[in-house]
From Swiss-Prot:
This is Transcriptional regulator MraZ. One of its GO terms (biological process) is negative regulation of DNA-templated transcription initiation. Gene3D superfamilies: Transcriptional regulator MraZ domain (3.40.1550.20). The lineage of its organism: Bacteria, Pseudomonadati, Pseudomonadota, Gammaproteobacteria, Alteromonadales. NCBIfam families: division/cell wall cluster transcriptional repressor MraZ. The gene is mraZ. It comes from Psychromonas ingrahamii (strain DSM 17664 / CCUG 51855 / 37). It comes from the Bacteria. Residues 5-52, 81-124 form the SpoVT-AbrB domain. CDD domains: MraZ_C, MraZ_N.
Length: 152
């Protein structure tokens, strides 16, 4: 499973070095292959191990190409989806269009989200975490069924 926030660097060629603690798992799970795409709700990228991405593709394929909202979702997620794999040094290339979309600079955050990573520009990540902590969970609104039953 992918968890934890890791401060890493984007090199001049647009590569990130995946932290060592994830490399064996990624090698065993997906032979180091993954798909990177945009997050449609946050200014970050989503990096899915290939096996997890195939599940996402199945869900996207099931959407209607005649429904404008579903078509828009397919267009954005699939249109930006880029396959890649870890090199022998455990580095992964992030496509220029994806780097531009997420406004990635040299310092980035690789954040495990169980079945995928989020890749953030470090300053944007810090601002997002600050906002999340300040906002907390809203009161006076109806929580989703998942949040009603969620506990730590």
């Amino acid at each position: 499973m992918l968890r934890g926030a890791n401060a890493i660097n984007l090199d001049t060629k647009g590569r990130i070095a995946i932290p060592t603690r994830y490399r064996d798992w990624l090698g065993d799970t997906c032979q180091g292959q993954f798909v990177c795409t945009i997050d449609i709700q946050s200014p970050c990228l989503l990096i899915y191990p290939l096996n997890e991405w195939l599940l996402i593709e199945t869900k996207l394929r099931a959407l209607s190409s005649t429904n404008p909202q579903e078509r828009r979702l397919q267009r954005l997620i699939l249109g930006y989806a880029t396959e890649s794999e870890l090199d022998k040094s455990g580095r992964a290339l992030i496509a220029p269009t994806l780097r531009q979309h997420a406004k990635l600079q040299k310092k980035v955050m690789l954040v495990g989200q169980l079945n995928k990573f989020e890749l953030w520009d470090e300053d944007m990540w810090n601002q997002q975490i600050k906002n999340d902590l300040e906002d907390g969970l809203p009161t006076g609104i109806e929580l989703s069924s998942g949040l009603r039953e969620f506990s730590l």
